[in-house]
C-alpha cells in the first residue's frame, strides 16, 4: 500500500491480475455506471451532494448527457454496488455498521488504520469483487469533514474513475484479442502504433490529398480515422487552428462524405489523455444522407517525421447515448505512438 500526500492521503490497493481473470466474474454494466453508497443514514445528503459534484454534463451536438449514470444506495443495500463497474463508498471513522465491516475485509491493516485515524482520506481498491471494477472509499472523522473532503476532491475522484476506466478498457481489449495483423500493418506501412481491438475492421485507407486510414465498428457505427499532413513546422501547424480545421475537413469529405459544423467547435489544449496536442470537438453532417453526429479530433505533432497527425473519433448512433462509445474510443486513442512499444 502506497500513501500519496496530496489534498488527502490516497492509498492504492491492488486487486487480481490478468492471470486470474478467467476465474473471476466480470463486473456488469458500463464504465459510466457509478454506485454511490453511504454507510450511515445520516450521510444521505452528503452522498447526494457528492453525486451532483462528481458528475458533469457532456454535450454531443445539441444533446446533453451526464458523464456518469449514478445510483445512490443506503447502507442496507450496499451489496448492490458489487455489480457496478465503479463504486464510491462514503463513510465516517469509527462506524461499525455493515458497510465498514465489508470495507475492512477489502483493505490492508495499514490502509484501514490510515482511514480510521486523523483526517481520513481516500482509498482506491481495484477489482474488489469482480474484474474490471474500481472502488473508491472516502472517509472523514465526522459528517462535516467528510462532506468537505468530497467537495474538495470531486474533480479528482472523477479523474481517478476515468483514468482507471481507460486502463480497464485497454486491459479488456487485450484479453478479448487485438487485431495484431492490422496493427503490424499500421506500423510497417505508416509508422504508428495503435492497439486495435479485433472488433474494429479496416474500412478504407489511402487518399492522395489526405493520407490515412479508417477503422470501423458497427451496431452502431463508430469510427477511428487517423490521417496526417507532412510539414516543415509541426509545432507551428499545431498552433494554427485554421490549418487543423482544414486537415480535419478534407479528411471528413474524403473518408466520411461529411461536412463539419463550425459553430459547434470547441477547442482545448492536450491530445488524448497523457499526450500533448490540441483537441477539437464538434459536429458533422452527412453529404449523402440526412443525418449527423459528434466527433472528437486530436491533433499531435511529430517533430521527428515532420508531421501532424489527426486522430478522429466519430459515431453515428441516433437516439442513443454517446458518452460510452467515446470513452471506449478515447481509451484506444491513448495507445497511439510513433515509437513501437517493446514486448
Regions found by a protein language model. Name each.
Residues 1-7:
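Sec-dependent signal peptide recognition
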Residues 12-15:
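C-terminal motif of bacterial Sec signal peptides marking the signal peptidase cleavage site
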Residues 21, 33-41, 56-57, 197-256, ...:
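Secretory pathway targeting signatures of secreted, lumenal, and periplasmic proteins
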Residues 23-153:
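Long, folded non-catalytic interaction modules
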Residues 77-86, 90-138, 250-306, 320-321:
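Signature of long, low-cysteine stretches enriched in small and polar/charged residues
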Residues 133-145, 224-229, 307-316:
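Short, well-ordered beta-strand elements
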Residues 145-173, 194, 200, 307-343:
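Surface-exposed amphipathic alpha-helical segments
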Residues 171-217:
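Loop-centered beta-sheet repeat module
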